[in-house]
Amino acid sequence: MYRIIDGRETSKISRLMIIAKENNAVFVCSNTKAMEIKARAYGLTGILFMSYHEFNNVIREKGYLDRNVVIDDLEDYINYTISPTFKFVGYSISEE
């Protein structure tokens, strides 16, 4: 699994887009239009972008996604997914 953890303005998105392209992965993000524009600016084509909402609907309806997945800003995705239920205040993660 790839983890891109870095500060602002450090090309995290372009690196994640390259990973998505190389792994034929769906790029899950909050704003697909903005990411499509960025991908074109980076010269990256052939990436399927899916919003958090679309991704959740596919998982809910099909129970799976038959492609690899990368998620831009995992914390935002978690907040989007669970925020109506409760307030997300922390998590842990293991280094690999």
Regions found by a protein language model. Give the residues of each.
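Conserved RecA-like ASCE ATPase "motif II neighborhood" in helicase/translocase motors
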Residues: T45-V89, E96
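Aromatic-residue detector
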Residues: E9, K21, D76, G90-S92
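Conserved P-loop
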Residues: M1-E61
